[in-house]
Amino acid sequence: MSEKKGEVPYLGIIINYDKDKKLDKFSIDTLRDRYLWQEESSPQEAFARAAVYASTFQEETDYAMAQRIYNYASDLWFMFSTPILSNGGTTRGLPISCFLNYVGDSIDELTDHFKENARLASSGGGIGGYWGDVRSDGTSTSNG
């Protein structure tokens, strides 16, 4: 837990370090290990970062919305998805948990699918694909 106490301004909203007490030791350890940035000393700071990120569109932040989202997360009424909590408001990884892309029925489309998935996975995105247009098992792939 952070040594900071009470309500303080952070990233344009008010956070409450005392709300760390709502989390058990395992939760705090997991959040520190997997989700907090090095500069963040408390899960409350990560919740605020994600809330401000989720409330920003075209470089305009709705701080009242960010405050509400932070309040809901810090009261444990809901929790951010992993990519939002770990990557939202940062320059690392992608803030999206799952990409579903199309797989076509040609060598070029198949290899493009694998290249695209490699790029997405290396940026932290979950991946999947629609394979419905690929010919079935046992179907000839030659022209002769």
Name the predicted role of every residue range.
Residues 1-144:
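Extended catalytic cores of very large enzyme megasubunits
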